């Protein structure tokens, strides 16, 4: 099955489906991408992202990209990013946030969220969590 995010090229010029290893990620026009298995570090659009065992959080410089727990992945490149591990899919990046499959369902400009359980990775690079607006009391 083809990845909805197309193909990425690793540092040796070999093509791979975006999201190899069970995690599909594309952060901001392929600026950040990584493999779910953590065995390959892929480069998309000149930006490098980091993989580690499928259970480590991922980051890429100033632009954020996360994969936690081996089943859920996040990318952030300034506008829209997509992640998914079969159960959850999110777009995060200042304009759109989508959630589904577990407990979160969002569609609102400017929201960016990572559930608390996803912040328990063994290591993280610039992990962010922005609290969601609460309804008036």
From Swiss-Prot:
Location of the region described as Disordered in the Swiss-Prot/TrEMBL record: 1-30
Protein name in the entry: Putative uncharacterized protein SPANXA2-OT1
Gene: SPANXA2-OT1
Domain of life where this protein originates: Eukaryota
Biased composition regions of type Gly residues, renumbered to the chain: 16-25
């Amino acid at each position: 099955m083809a990845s909805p995010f197309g193909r990425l090229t690793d540092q040796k010029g070999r093509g791979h489906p975006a999201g190899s290893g069970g995690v599909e990620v594309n952060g901001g026009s392929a600026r950040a991408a990584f493999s779910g298995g953590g065995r390959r570090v892929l480069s998309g659009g000149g930006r490098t992202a980091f993989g580690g065992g499928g259970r480590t959080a991922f980051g890429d410089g100033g632009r954020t990209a996360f994969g936690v727990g081996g089943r859920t992945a996040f990318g952030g490149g300034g506008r829209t990013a997509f992640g998914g591990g079969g159960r959850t899919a999110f777009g995060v990046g200042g304009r759109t946030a989508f959630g589904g499959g577990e407990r979160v369902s969002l569609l609102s400009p400017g929201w960016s969220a990572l559930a608390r359980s996803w912040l328990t990775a063994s290591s993280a690079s610039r992990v962010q969590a922005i609290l969601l607006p609460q309804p008036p009391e």
